[in-house]
Amino acid sequence: MIQSSSSISQDSLDLPSILSTFSADEPEDEPSPTAVKSTKPQRPTECLICGNSANGHHYDVASCNGCKTFFRRMCVSDRSFECKAKGDCFDLTKRKVPLKCRACRHQKCISVGMNPLAMEVDEKAASSSNFKKLVKRAQDLEPDDDCQVTAVVNKMQIVKPVDSIESKMQNITDMLVYLETKVERFRKSAYNPHWNEFSGLEYLLESECRIGFGDRFGPMPGWPLRRDQLGPPRLPKPPSPGKPRDSQHSQNIKQWFFYNLLTTVEYAKTFMFFHRLSSRDKLILTRHVALACTNLHISYSSIRRNLEVIIEPDGSEPMTFNDTHYSASVMSVAPLIRCQIKNIEYLLLKAIVLCNPAVPDLSAKSQEIISLERVKYADALFNYCLRSRSDGPPHFAQLIQIIDVLERQQRMQKDLHLLLVAPKVAKLPKDLVMRVIEDIMDS
């Protein structure tokens, strides 16, 4: 049962960890157009730090969401980085796209004039070593003056955050919007690993987070594929004598059921709360929620393109064995269309589906952690419905009911997998078995 309360403490905003290392390229949802005077300032178009599209002026500088978030996190932390190159990784006069270097990115934020005094931070954050240095620089204080933070606090240039529900909800939705851009980039990227790289779900959970591979590998060339390149989706078949088994894997054609589940697992690994769970509870939770999150993701991706069927990014359709199997694969599409789900609602609903404390066999400690996370995202969804829908509470209830559809859908898919797919998989050589799929479907 999901309960929605009207208060969330600022300290409870346990947001995706992906935000600390990457920049956002896509603009936030813009407000509804209103009457605008001709003297209205023009919105900046280019981030002065990384050169991507700017979302506005942040800390006195035209910048994107990613650079704003990066500068703030660096300011309130004690971490420091050194450039491993020549110190010019973010010099856009020497290159069109900056290199991935946190030291140079931080220095560029400072050099273009990002102002730490424009931040709202509490006294704990203001005591961080980076913030002290930047405040000293901004105020041009003497190096031996150790009272700069106190002076700034006394001058009320640092204030405690306003206890506003709207600002807290906005923080949550901004983070999820940014994370989703990374998830979609990963899904459409040229990164296409062989399933043999992963010995199983447990190995995948304990290995590095791969969401950033979307930026590293770039988009898959040649997508969408031509119809004659696609062919019907099918399970890998035992190779003919003398034929190399690697021929089952194509560099530009993905095994989408495997890759979509891989994407969902990497999505889960970006959440800070997830790393507070034990290895055992991570495995238990992921085995139960991965398929439901995947179904919601691919269903929403399809209806966002005005499609009533599941179409993957390369233009292919998912593998189905019969009408019952097909019906199970598209079960969640109609409810999403019926409730006219918005992007923010989808993002919050997916986070709620991920945070399921009712999964059997979870430890009491993990149930408590996950329950608090679910309430946080449920609160955000409820508040969003109230602010953006005339029928806010009924619409919220309709969205929450989709979770039951997703549960029934994944239960049917797992039963059909056991009936139709598992017998075929049992006949395959071990190196052709996608262990990540089997670990999730056999639960």
Swiss-Prot record:
Segments of skewed composition (Pro residues): 233-242
Mapped zinc finger ranges (NR C4-type): 47-67, 83-104
Span list, region Disordered: 1-40, 225-249
PROSITE patterns: NR_LBD, NUCLEAR_REC_DBD_1, NUCLEAR_REC_DBD_2
DNA-binding region(s), chain positions: 44-121
Alphabetized UniProt keyword annotations: DNA-binding, Metal-binding, Nucleus, Receptor, Transcription, Transcription regulation, Zinc, Zinc-finger
Protein role: Orphan nuclear receptor (Potential). Required for embryonic and larval morphogenesis and probably for seam cell positioning and migration.
This protein's name: Nuclear hormone receptor family member nhr-60
Biological source species: Caenorhabditis elegans
Gene: nhr-60
